[in-house]
Amino acid sequence: MSIVCTFFLFLLNTSFAFAFAIPKPPIVRRLSTTVTSNSTASSCSANGNPIDECWRCDENWKDNRKNLADCAVGFGRDSIGGRAGEFYTVTDSGDDNPLNPTPGTLRYAATQDQPLWIIFDRDMVIQLKQDLQVASYKTIDGRGNNVQIAYGPCLTLYKVSNIIINNLYIHDCVPVKRNALSSLGGYSDGDGISIFESRDIWIDHCTLEKCYDGLIDAVNGSTDITISNSYMLNHNEVMLLGHSDEYSGDRDMRVTIAFNYFGEGLVQRMPRCRHGYFHIVNNIYRDWKMYAIGGSANPTIFSQGNVFIASNNQFTKEVTKRESADGDEEWKEWNWKSEGDEMVNGAFFTPSGKEDSPSYAKFSSMVARPASLLKTTHPSVGVLSCEIDQAC
Protein backbone atom coordinates (compact mmCIF):
# COMPACT_ATOMS: atom_id res chain seq x y z
CA MET A 1 0.00 0.00 0.00
CA SER A 2 1.38 3.41 -0.95
CA ILE A 3 2.36 5.98 1.63
CA VAL A 4 -0.32 8.34 0.29
CA CYS A 5 -3.04 5.69 0.64
CA THR A 6 -1.90 4.78 4.14
CA PHE A 7 -1.94 8.43 5.17
CA PHE A 8 -5.44 8.86 3.72
CA LEU A 9 -6.76 5.91 5.72
CA PHE A 10 -5.14 7.32 8.87
CA LEU A 11 -6.94 10.64 8.35
CA LEU A 12 -10.22 8.85 7.65
CA ASN A 13 -10.00 6.77 10.82
CA THR A 14 -8.96 9.78 12.89
CA SER A 15 -11.87 11.85 11.58
CA PHE A 16 -14.27 8.97 12.27
CA ALA A 17 -13.04 8.72 15.86
CA PHE A 18 -13.37 12.46 16.46
CA ALA A 19 -16.84 12.52 14.92
CA PHE A 20 -18.08 10.11 17.57
CA ALA A 21 -15.98 11.35 20.48
CA ILE A 22 -18.03 12.11 23.58
CA PRO A 23 -17.59 15.76 24.61
CA LYS A 24 -16.38 16.35 28.14
CA PRO A 25 -18.65 18.03 30.70
CA PRO A 26 -18.08 21.76 31.25
CA ILE A 27 -15.76 22.82 34.04
CA VAL A 28 -15.97 25.82 36.33
CA ARG A 29 -14.14 28.88 35.08
CA ARG A 30 -12.14 31.14 37.39
CA LEU A 31 -14.40 32.73 39.99
CA SER A 32 -13.63 36.41 39.41
CA THR A 33 -10.91 38.97 39.88
CA THR A 34 -12.25 39.68 43.37
CA VAL A 35 -12.10 36.10 44.60
CA THR A 36 -8.80 34.27 44.90
CA SER A 37 -8.46 30.86 43.29
CA ASN A 38 -5.70 28.31 43.81
CA SER A 39 -6.18 25.31 41.54
CA THR A 40 -3.03 23.60 42.87
CA ALA A 41 -4.55 22.93 46.27
CA SER A 42 -5.53 19.36 47.05
CA SER A 43 -9.06 18.67 45.84
CA CYS A 44 -9.53 15.51 47.89
CA SER A 45 -8.90 17.33 51.17
CA ALA A 46 -11.38 19.95 49.93
CA ASN A 47 -10.86 22.40 52.83
CA GLY A 48 -13.47 20.93 55.11
CA ASN A 49 -15.90 19.42 52.63
CA PRO A 50 -16.85 16.29 54.61
CA ILE A 51 -18.30 14.46 51.60
CA ASP A 52 -15.16 14.71 49.50
CA GLU A 53 -12.85 14.08 52.44
CA CYS A 54 -14.79 10.88 53.12
CA TRP A 55 -13.79 9.15 49.87
CA ARG A 56 -11.83 11.19 47.32
CA CYS A 57 -8.39 10.69 48.90
CA ASP A 58 -8.75 6.91 48.62
CA GLU A 59 -6.55 5.71 45.73
CA ASN A 60 -8.57 2.48 45.74
CA TRP A 61 -11.92 4.22 45.32
CA LYS A 62 -12.74 1.91 42.39
CA ASP A 63 -12.56 -1.16 44.65
CA ASN A 64 -14.27 0.66 47.51
CA ARG A 65 -17.11 2.27 45.59
CA LYS A 66 -19.74 1.43 48.18
CA ASN A 67 -17.92 3.48 50.82
CA LEU A 68 -19.57 6.45 49.12
CA ALA A 69 -22.85 5.49 50.79
CA ASP A 70 -21.31 6.44 54.15
CA CYS A 71 -20.38 9.94 53.01
CA ALA A 72 -23.65 11.85 52.65
CA VAL A 73 -24.47 14.84 54.84
CA GLY A 74 -27.59 16.87 55.38
CA PHE A 75 -31.18 15.74 55.24
CA GLY A 76 -30.40 13.04 52.66
CA ARG A 77 -27.65 11.48 54.76
CA ASP A 78 -29.58 8.27 55.46
CA SER A 79 -29.81 7.30 51.80
CA ILE A 80 -27.92 4.04 51.24
CA GLY A 81 -28.73 3.65 47.57
CA GLY A 82 -27.81 0.19 46.34
CA ARG A 83 -25.21 -0.53 49.01
CA ALA A 84 -26.94 -3.76 50.07
CA GLY A 85 -27.05 -5.10 46.51
CA GLU A 86 -24.67 -6.38 43.88
CA PHE A 87 -22.79 -4.35 41.30
CA TYR A 88 -24.37 -4.10 37.87
CA THR A 89 -22.26 -2.88 34.95
CA VAL A 90 -23.98 -1.00 32.14
CA THR A 91 -22.47 -2.13 28.83
CA ASP A 92 -25.07 -0.83 26.37
CA SER A 93 -25.90 2.87 25.93
CA GLY A 94 -29.12 2.10 24.05
CA ASP A 95 -32.76 2.37 25.09
CA ASP A 96 -34.48 0.62 22.20
CA ASN A 97 -37.34 -0.96 24.15
CA PRO A 98 -38.40 0.97 27.27
CA LEU A 99 -41.26 -1.49 27.95
CA ASN A 100 -38.94 -4.49 27.87
CA PRO A 101 -35.44 -3.16 28.58
CA THR A 102 -32.44 -4.95 27.12
CA PRO A 103 -30.04 -6.46 29.69
CA GLY A 104 -26.92 -4.35 29.89
CA THR A 105 -28.76 -1.04 29.57
CA LEU A 106 -29.17 1.56 32.28
CA ARG A 107 -32.95 1.20 32.11
CA TYR A 108 -32.71 -2.55 32.70
CA ALA A 109 -30.57 -2.03 35.79
CA ALA A 110 -32.38 0.96 37.26
CA THR A 111 -35.83 -0.66 37.09
CA GLN A 112 -34.96 -3.93 38.83
CA ASP A 113 -36.72 -4.67 42.11
CA GLN A 114 -33.59 -5.55 44.08
CA PRO A 115 -30.92 -3.13 45.35
CA LEU A 116 -28.15 -2.52 42.80
CA TRP A 117 -25.00 -0.43 42.62
CA ILE A 118 -24.90 0.56 38.94
CA ILE A 119 -21.58 1.37 37.23
CA PHE A 120 -20.49 1.77 33.60
CA ASP A 121 -17.91 -0.04 31.47
CA ARG A 122 -16.94 2.98 29.34
CA ASP A 123 -17.81 6.56 28.41
CA MET A 124 -21.30 6.83 26.95
CA VAL A 125 -24.13 9.19 26.05
CA ILE A 126 -27.51 7.69 26.91
CA GLN A 127 -30.44 9.12 24.94
CA LEU A 128 -33.58 7.81 26.59
CA LYS A 129 -36.82 7.30 24.69
CA GLN A 130 -38.97 7.54 27.84
CA ASP A 131 -38.10 9.13 31.16
CA LEU A 132 -36.29 6.58 33.31
CA GLN A 133 -38.32 5.85 36.46
CA VAL A 134 -35.63 4.62 38.83
CA ALA A 135 -36.65 1.97 41.38
CA SER A 136 -35.81 2.17 45.09
CA TYR A 137 -32.41 1.23 46.53
CA LYS A 138 -30.33 2.15 43.51
CA THR A 139 -27.01 3.89 43.13
CA ILE A 140 -26.14 5.24 39.69
CA ASP A 141 -22.37 5.74 39.92
CA GLY A 142 -20.65 7.33 36.91
CA ARG A 143 -17.22 7.68 38.52
CA GLY A 144 -14.33 6.69 36.27
CA ASN A 145 -16.23 7.36 33.04
CA ASN A 146 -17.84 10.24 31.18
CA VAL A 147 -21.50 9.22 31.46
CA GLN A 148 -24.12 11.55 30.03
CA ILE A 149 -27.91 11.41 29.96
CA ALA A 150 -29.01 13.83 27.27
CA TYR A 151 -31.10 14.76 24.22
CA GLY A 152 -34.26 13.04 25.44
CA PRO A 153 -36.32 12.62 28.60
CA CYS A 154 -34.17 12.09 31.68
CA LEU A 155 -34.56 10.75 35.25
CA THR A 156 -37.72 10.42 37.35
CA LEU A 157 -37.86 9.31 40.99
CA TYR A 158 -41.51 8.42 41.67
CA LYS A 159 -42.63 7.00 45.02
CA VAL A 160 -39.16 5.62 45.76
CA SER A 161 -36.55 5.85 48.49
CA ASN A 162 -32.82 5.37 48.95
CA ILE A 163 -31.44 6.71 45.70
CA ILE A 164 -27.86 7.91 45.14
CA ILE A 165 -26.97 9.61 41.84
CA ASN A 166 -23.29 10.42 41.44
CA ASN A 167 -21.03 11.75 38.69
CA LEU A 168 -23.50 12.10 35.80
CA TYR A 169 -23.62 14.88 33.21
CA ILE A 170 -27.33 15.51 32.62
CA HIS A 171 -28.24 17.99 29.92
CA ASP A 172 -30.61 18.92 27.09
CA CYS A 173 -33.50 16.99 28.66
CA VAL A 174 -36.87 17.28 26.92
CA PRO A 175 -40.48 16.22 27.64
CA VAL A 176 -42.05 13.27 25.81
CA LYS A 177 -45.43 11.58 25.87
CA ARG A 178 -45.26 8.61 28.20
CA ASN A 179 -46.33 5.19 27.01
CA ALA A 180 -49.69 3.77 28.06
CA LEU A 181 -48.19 1.52 30.74
CA SER A 182 -46.42 4.32 32.61
CA SER A 183 -47.64 4.74 36.17
CA LEU A 184 -47.45 8.52 35.75
CA GLY A 185 -49.13 8.96 32.36
CA GLY A 186 -49.26 12.18 30.38
CA TYR A 187 -45.98 13.82 29.44
CA SER A 188 -42.69 13.85 31.28
CA ASP A 189 -41.74 17.32 32.53
CA GLY A 190 -38.44 17.72 30.75
CA ASP A 191 -36.55 18.00 34.06
CA GLY A 192 -33.02 16.73 34.51
CA ILE A 193 -34.12 14.91 37.67
CA SER A 194 -37.80 14.90 38.74
CA ILE A 195 -38.54 13.78 42.31
CA PHE A 196 -42.17 12.91 43.22
CA GLU A 197 -43.35 11.53 46.57
CA SER A 198 -39.87 10.20 47.30
CA ARG A 199 -37.47 10.32 50.23
CA ASP A 200 -33.87 9.62 51.20
CA ILE A 201 -32.37 10.97 48.00
CA TRP A 202 -28.74 12.06 47.50
CA ILE A 203 -27.53 13.75 44.30
CA ASP A 204 -23.78 14.42 44.32
CA HIS A 205 -21.10 15.61 41.89
CA CYS A 206 -23.42 15.95 38.91
CA THR A 207 -23.29 18.57 36.17
CA LEU A 208 -26.67 19.76 34.89
CA GLU A 209 -27.64 22.27 32.22
CA LYS A 210 -30.05 23.21 29.42
CA CYS A 211 -33.18 21.25 30.29
CA TYR A 212 -36.72 22.05 29.17
CA ASP A 213 -38.17 22.61 32.65
CA GLY A 214 -36.12 22.35 35.85
CA LEU A 215 -32.68 20.91 36.39
CA ILE A 216 -33.82 19.28 39.65
CA ASP A 217 -37.41 19.50 40.92
CA ALA A 218 -38.75 17.87 44.10
CA VAL A 219 -42.51 17.95 44.75
CA ASN A 220 -45.56 16.18 46.18
CA GLY A 221 -44.35 15.32 49.65
CA SER A 222 -40.76 14.44 48.78
CA THR A 223 -38.35 14.90 51.68
CA ASP A 224 -34.95 14.10 53.19
CA ILE A 225 -32.97 15.15 50.15
CA THR A 226 -29.37 16.34 49.77
CA ILE A 227 -28.08 17.97 46.59
CA SER A 228 -24.33 18.46 46.87
CA ASN A 229 -21.10 19.21 44.99
CA SER A 230 -22.95 19.76 41.73
CA TYR A 231 -22.40 22.29 38.95
CA MET A 232 -25.45 23.92 37.44
CA LEU A 233 -25.30 26.32 34.51
CA ASN A 234 -27.10 27.68 31.43
CA HIS A 235 -30.68 27.36 32.60
CA ASN A 236 -33.70 29.47 33.54
CA GLU A 237 -35.76 27.82 36.31
CA VAL A 238 -33.08 25.81 38.06
CA MET A 239 -34.66 24.06 41.03
CA LEU A 240 -38.24 23.88 42.32
CA LEU A 241 -38.80 22.50 45.82
CA GLY A 242 -42.51 22.24 46.56
CA HIS A 243 -45.45 21.57 44.26
CA SER A 244 -47.72 24.58 44.79
CA ASP A 245 -48.75 27.09 47.43
CA GLU A 246 -51.96 25.12 47.99
CA TYR A 247 -50.33 21.70 48.39
CA SER A 248 -49.92 21.20 52.13
CA GLY A 249 -48.20 17.83 51.67
CA ASP A 250 -44.90 19.65 51.21
CA ARG A 251 -44.94 21.17 54.70
CA ASP A 252 -42.63 18.45 55.97
CA MET A 253 -40.19 18.69 53.07
CA ARG A 254 -36.56 18.89 54.19
CA VAL A 255 -33.80 19.60 51.69
CA THR A 256 -30.10 20.37 52.06
CA ILE A 257 -28.32 22.26 49.26
CA ALA A 258 -24.57 22.07 49.97
CA PHE A 259 -21.20 22.68 48.27
CA ASN A 260 -22.74 23.37 44.85
CA TYR A 261 -21.69 25.89 42.24
CA PHE A 262 -24.51 27.86 40.63
CA GLY A 263 -22.67 29.20 37.63
CA GLU A 264 -22.95 31.11 34.41
CA GLY A 265 -26.19 31.45 32.49
CA LEU A 266 -28.56 30.81 35.41
CA VAL A 267 -31.62 33.01 35.84
CA GLN A 268 -33.69 32.06 38.91
CA ARG A 269 -34.83 29.34 41.36
CA MET A 270 -31.59 28.26 43.06
CA PRO A 271 -33.84 27.05 44.65
CA ARG A 272 -37.47 28.26 44.72
CA CYS A 273 -39.01 26.87 47.91
CA ARG A 274 -42.51 26.23 49.24
CA HIS A 275 -43.74 25.27 52.72
CA GLY A 276 -40.85 23.14 53.98
CA TYR A 277 -37.40 23.49 55.54
CA PHE A 278 -34.37 24.31 53.42
CA HIS A 279 -30.76 24.43 54.59
CA ILE A 280 -28.57 26.15 51.98
CA VAL A 281 -24.94 25.68 52.98
CA ASN A 282 -21.50 26.52 51.54
CA ASN A 283 -22.55 27.07 47.95
CA ILE A 284 -21.13 29.55 45.45
CA TYR A 285 -23.57 31.65 43.42
CA ARG A 286 -22.49 33.92 40.59
CA ASP A 287 -24.18 36.30 38.17
CA TRP A 288 -27.81 35.21 38.61
CA LYS A 289 -29.99 37.12 36.15
CA MET A 290 -33.13 37.56 38.30
CA TYR A 291 -32.62 36.18 41.81
CA ALA A 292 -30.88 33.26 43.51
CA ILE A 293 -33.10 32.04 46.37
CA GLY A 294 -36.86 32.50 46.31
CA GLY A 295 -40.04 31.13 47.78
CA SER A 296 -43.67 31.36 48.74
CA ALA A 297 -46.11 29.75 51.19
CA ASN A 298 -44.00 30.34 54.30
CA PRO A 299 -40.90 28.17 53.79
CA THR A 300 -38.11 28.23 56.38
CA ILE A 301 -34.82 29.09 54.64
CA PHE A 302 -31.47 29.03 56.45
CA SER A 303 -28.65 30.33 54.25
CA GLN A 304 -25.31 29.62 55.87
CA GLY A 305 -21.70 30.12 54.76
CA ASN A 306 -22.45 30.77 51.09
CA VAL A 307 -20.66 33.11 48.67
CA PHE A 308 -22.96 35.29 46.55
CA ILE A 309 -21.24 37.06 43.64
CA ALA A 310 -23.67 39.47 42.00
CA SER A 311 -23.39 40.53 38.37
CA ASN A 312 -22.73 44.13 37.37
CA ASN A 313 -26.44 44.64 36.66
CA GLN A 314 -27.65 47.05 39.36
CA PHE A 315 -31.16 45.56 39.23
CA THR A 316 -30.16 41.98 40.12
CA LYS A 317 -28.08 42.46 43.25
CA GLU A 318 -30.67 40.97 45.61
CA VAL A 319 -30.21 37.30 46.43
CA THR A 320 -33.79 36.74 47.59
CA LYS A 321 -37.29 36.97 46.15
CA ARG A 322 -40.65 36.41 47.87
CA GLU A 323 -43.87 35.68 46.06
CA SER A 324 -46.77 36.57 48.33
CA ALA A 325 -50.41 37.13 47.46
CA ASP A 326 -50.88 39.33 50.53
CA GLY A 327 -47.81 41.50 50.09
CA ASP A 328 -45.03 42.42 52.51
CA GLU A 329 -47.01 41.92 55.69
CA GLU A 330 -47.29 38.21 54.96
CA TRP A 331 -43.72 37.42 54.01
CA LYS A 332 -42.23 39.45 56.83
CA GLU A 333 -43.32 36.61 59.11
CA TRP A 334 -41.48 33.94 57.10
CA ASN A 335 -38.25 32.73 58.69
CA TRP A 336 -35.44 33.46 56.20
CA LYS A 337 -32.00 33.92 57.68
CA SER A 338 -28.49 34.58 56.36
CA GLU A 339 -25.62 33.60 58.65
CA GLY A 340 -21.95 33.82 57.71
CA ASP A 341 -22.67 34.43 54.02
CA GLU A 342 -20.22 36.55 52.01
CA MET A 343 -21.71 39.14 49.67
CA VAL A 344 -19.59 40.18 46.67
CA ASN A 345 -20.11 43.02 44.19
CA GLY A 346 -23.10 44.50 46.00
CA ALA A 347 -25.08 41.30 46.56
CA PHE A 348 -27.53 41.43 49.47
CA PHE A 349 -29.88 39.03 51.27
CA THR A 350 -33.19 40.33 52.68
CA PRO A 351 -33.95 38.45 55.93
CA SER A 352 -37.36 38.09 57.51
CA GLY A 353 -39.10 36.49 60.47
CA LYS A 354 -37.50 35.86 63.82
CA GLU A 355 -33.71 36.07 63.93
CA ASP A 356 -33.59 33.61 66.84
CA SER A 357 -36.36 31.26 65.72
CA PRO A 358 -35.83 27.74 67.11
CA SER A 359 -36.68 26.39 63.66
CA TYR A 360 -33.16 27.26 62.46
CA ALA A 361 -31.54 25.03 65.05
CA LYS A 362 -34.14 22.30 64.65
CA PHE A 363 -33.64 22.09 60.92
CA SER A 364 -29.92 22.76 60.70
CA SER A 365 -28.88 19.64 58.82
CA MET A 366 -25.07 19.94 58.97
CA VAL A 367 -22.24 22.13 60.21
CA ALA A 368 -21.35 24.99 57.87
CA ARG A 369 -17.71 25.84 57.26
CA PRO A 370 -16.65 29.51 56.92
CA ALA A 371 -17.56 31.04 53.57
CA SER A 372 -13.97 32.29 53.27
CA LEU A 373 -12.80 28.71 52.71
CA LEU A 374 -14.83 28.53 49.51
CA LYS A 375 -12.56 31.19 48.03
CA THR A 376 -9.21 29.53 48.73
CA THR A 377 -9.42 26.73 46.16
CA HIS A 378 -10.89 26.36 42.70
CA PRO A 379 -14.40 24.86 43.06
CA SER A 380 -14.19 21.07 42.74
CA VAL A 381 -17.78 20.47 41.71
CA GLY A 382 -19.76 18.66 39.07
CA VAL A 383 -18.57 15.56 37.25
CA LEU A 384 -15.11 14.41 38.36
CA SER A 385 -12.42 12.92 36.12
CA CYS A 386 -11.48 10.03 38.39
CA GLU A 387 -8.49 7.91 37.34
CA ILE A 388 -7.94 4.32 38.44
CA ASP A 389 -5.43 3.89 41.30
CA GLN A 390 -5.33 7.62 41.97
CA ALA A 391 -7.07 9.86 44.46
CA CYS A 392 -10.05 11.36 42.70
Swiss-Prot record:
What's the name of the protein? Putative pectate lyase 21
Top-rank EC class of the record's enzyme: lyase
Keyword terms of this UniProt record: Calcium, Glycoprotein, Lyase, Metal-binding, Signal
Q: How does the cofactor attach, per the note? A: Binds 1 Ca(2+) ion. Required for its activity.
**Gene Ontology molecular functions:** metal ion binding; pectate lyase activity
Glyco sites are at: 38, 220
Instruction: Give the species this sequence originates from.
Output: Arabidopsis thaliana (Mouse-ear cress)
Pathway membership: Glycan metabolism; pectin degradation; 2-dehydro-3-deoxy-D-gluconate from pectin: step 2/5
Segment forming the signal sequence? 1-21
Cofactor(s) in the UniProt record:
Ca(2+)
Q: Which Pfam families match?
A: Pectate_lyase_4
